[in-house]
């Protein structure tokens, strides 16, 4: 009886351990897939998202060129919170190819490269009106040491094709490396999935070309989607197998003669990446005060001139009457 109880206890503990192990494994796999699906591959591969040529590195994976727009104030005062509005326009009716080959809505993402000293505004400095414009977005620093570079995404494009960044301007009085100057701001924005992964491999959201010339001798439709094409290369007497993942639409058929690099599929990509820039002036408050003083003095001078002119006209009129 005692041996039976011990056996039951051991069986129960073993079952529990296996269940916990499976749960941990599922969590690790899920977490890894989510993190790798996050379109911040640039953070993993590049210290700075903007190359010396001015090109933003997101364009290495998102090959199609699409527009993006940024709107910022012409000038801001030190230690002031302002809005940087990034617009990523696209046709909301479009559906993109997902990693499993099915169709789904497009996500969007953006990277905002601010001047040194500018950074994401703290929550207690953001007004309720600005929070309402931001929605439920959560911004990140590109690097812990690069607070002036912000990233966001992927987020649903139908809800966030216009993204409001809350920015805090620096104060040269407390930051000695910041000056009252005109500064550039750079932005990159993408809609939809990329065509190339950071390791150089293709996603299923791009065109697949023939890796050899010859005759398509066999096409096998795979159980989980996609195709396996066998190309008979008569010139070299060999067979080449091209694997096409689920998503792209096949354009060739068995028995068809194809050339090297000929497209085997359609291009399913409906998204793309764009970059833009803007300028902002960090304005010295004393200059603003001086400008107001100048305008006030000009207005007063004009008033005095008008009064003096009227007084002179009255004197002339009285002399004529006399």
UniProtKB/Swiss-Prot annotation:
Classification via InterPro entries: Cyt-f_TM, Cyt_f, Cyt_f_lg_dom, Cyt_f_lg_dom_sf, Rudment_hybrid_motif
Residues reported to bind heme: 38, 58, 61-62
GO CC list: chloroplast thylakoid membrane
Chief localization: plastid
Cofactor note: Binds 1 heme group covalently.
Cofactor: heme
Signal peptide as annotated in the record: 1-35
UniProt-annotated location(s): Plastid, Chloroplast thylakoid membrane
A biological-process GO annotation: photosynthesis
UniProt membrane topology term: Single-pass membrane protein
Membrane spanning stretches: 288-308
GO function term, MF aspect, one: heme binding
Swiss-Prot/TrEMBL keywords: Chloroplast, Electron transport, Heme, Iron, Membrane, Metal-binding, Photosynthesis, Plastid, Signal, Thylakoid, Transmembrane, Transmembrane helix, Transport
Subunit structure: The 4 large subunits of the cytochrome b6-f complex are cytochrome b6, subunit IV (17 kDa polypeptide, petD), cytochrome f and the Rieske protein, while the 4 small subunits are PetG, PetL, PetM and PetN. The complex functions as a dimer.
Family: Belongs to the cytochrome f family.
Functional note: Component of the cytochrome b6-f complex, which mediates electron transfer between photosystem II (PSII) and photosystem I (PSI), cyclic electron flow around PSI, and state transitions.
PANTHER family registered for this protein in UniProt: CYTOCHROME F, PTHR33288
Stated name of the protein: Cytochrome f
Organism: Nandina domestica
Organismal lineage: Eukaryota, Viridiplantae, Streptophyta, Embryophyta, Tracheophyta
Gene name of the encoded protein: petA
């Amino acid at each position: 009886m005692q041996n039976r109880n011990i056996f039951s206890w051991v069986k129960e503990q073993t079952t529990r351990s296996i269940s916990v192990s499976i749960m941990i494994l599922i969590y690790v796999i899920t977490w890894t897939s989510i993190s790798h699906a996050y379109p911040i591959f640039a953070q993993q591969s590049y210290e700075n998202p903007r190359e010396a040529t001015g090109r933003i590195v997101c364009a290495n994976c998102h090959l199609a060129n699409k527009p993006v727009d940024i709107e910022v104030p012409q000038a801001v005062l030190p230690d002031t919170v302002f809005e940087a509005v990034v617009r990523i326009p696209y046709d909301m009716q479009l559906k993109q190819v997902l990693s499993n080959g099915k169709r789904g809505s497009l996500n969007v993402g953006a990277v905002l490269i601010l001047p040194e000293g500018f950074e994401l505004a703290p929550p207690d400095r953001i007004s309720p009106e600005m929070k309402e414009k931001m929605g439920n977005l959560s911004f990140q620093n590109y690097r812990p040491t690069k607070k002036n570079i912000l990233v966001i995404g992927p987020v649903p494009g139908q809800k966030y094709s216009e993204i409001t960044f809350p920015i805090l301007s620096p104060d040269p009085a407390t930051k000695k490396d910041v000056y009252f100057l005109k500064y550039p701001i750079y932005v990159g924005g993408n809609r939809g999935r990329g065509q190339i992964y950071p390791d150089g491999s293709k996603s299923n959201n791009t065109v697949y070309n023939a890796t050899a010339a010859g005759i398509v001798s066999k096409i096998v439709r795979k159980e989980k989607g996609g195709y396996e094409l066998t190309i008979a290369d008569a010139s070299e007497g060999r067979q080449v197998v091209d694997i096409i993942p689920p998503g792209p639409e096949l354009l060739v058929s068995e028995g068809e003669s194809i050339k090297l690099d000929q497209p085997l599929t359609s291009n399913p990509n409906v998204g793309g990446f764009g970059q833009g820039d803007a300028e902002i002036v960090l304005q010295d408050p004393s200059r603003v005060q001086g400008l107001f003083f100048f305008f006030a003095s000009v207005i007063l001078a004009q008033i005095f001139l008008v009064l003096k002119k009227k007084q002179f006209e009255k004197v002339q009129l009285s002399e004529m009457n006399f």
